Amino acid sequence: MNRRLAIKQIMIFGGGLALLPSGLRAAGKASVWLNHVRMDAAEEKLLGEIAEIIIPKTTTPGAKDLGLHLFVMKMVDDCYKPQDQKRFMSGLAAFKGLDPTALKEMVVQVNAGKAESDDIKAFFRIMKQQTINGYLNSKYVMTNLVKWELVPARYNGYFPVKS
């Protein structure tokens, strides 16, 4: 057998194996791999809409453009206790089925402290906190909006000292 042909076939087979997990994922699943929380594509889209209400697109990219809803999903899955994850999911359920104007109204009311239940308050607290955290630590903000110094608080030997 020709060595080039064998190497070519092995590379094609390896590429197919690398793509296999994405093809086996069921339709309607979340686009981020989650271990502890179960979300579907509709809930992921809803999180994206809520994040976009929290940080809308202006002259800078909004939350959806930066993928902050994916960050929130991963943070809730990895960093929160199971009871907080359950409260997050039950709070998210209250936002399902709302049209965009009703969704915005509900987010404004919950942000003003007029939530119907503690689960909704817990959901919105986590959602807002992690959305802002993700925005401030996003690549766009850290490279375009924050002045970066290689060595922060450098030594200034000529600083005037009053005696």
Task: Identify the residue ranges that each predicted region occupies.
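A glycine-rich, hydrophobic loop/mini-helix early in the fold
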Residues: 63
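Second-shell loop/turn segments in exported
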Residues: 32-38, 54-60, 74-82
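Mature-region segments of soluble proteins
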Residues: 45, 49-52, 67-163
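Sec-dependent signal peptide hydrophobic core
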Residues: 10-15
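Short, hydrophobic/aromatic alpha-helical segments in well-folded domains
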Residues: 2, 6-9, 131
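C-terminal segment of N-terminal export signals and the immediately downstream linker at the start
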Residues: 1-5, 20-54
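A short hydrophobic/aromatic micro-motif that marks alpha-helical segments and, especially, helix-coil
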Residues: 17-18, 114
